[in-house]
């Protein structure tokens, strides 16, 4: 039996035994730590999280739970209307963010300079000159003996 019971045993009005799981985690000198974690998570949840862990993992887990619970404890949400108000203002906040980003990008961009380059000159291939050839093709018409000259390109 310990002379100074841990905060968990003191909260439960129990006598703290030598192998108490919470003795190292919540000593009697640190009341605030247990109070914050207990109010946010509760004792049953805390016990559930810590029961299967090694002593070193328990210390890390307790520290993490405390750091997660402290902001909620210090700044509790007053009512659900604050949350709804934040959700309703979300699109407007994003629109403002986009406009600010566009202005910032515009301040970084340089004016675009277009150089007038001469038009490319197209040359003909020297191996096969393109010459229009005329050939005769027969077409069907009222006069079957008519021959028509067609230009191929």
UniProtKB/Swiss-Prot annotation:
Residue numbers spanned by region Disordered: 126-153
Cited InterPro entries: LOB
Disulfide pairings: none
Pfam families referenced in this protein's UniProt entry, alphabetically: LOB
Compositional bias segments (type: Basic and acidic residues): 140-153
Positions of the LOB domain: 4-105
Domain of life: Eukaryota
Family affiliation: Belongs to the LOB domain-containing protein family.
Name of this chain's protein: LOB domain-containing protein 26
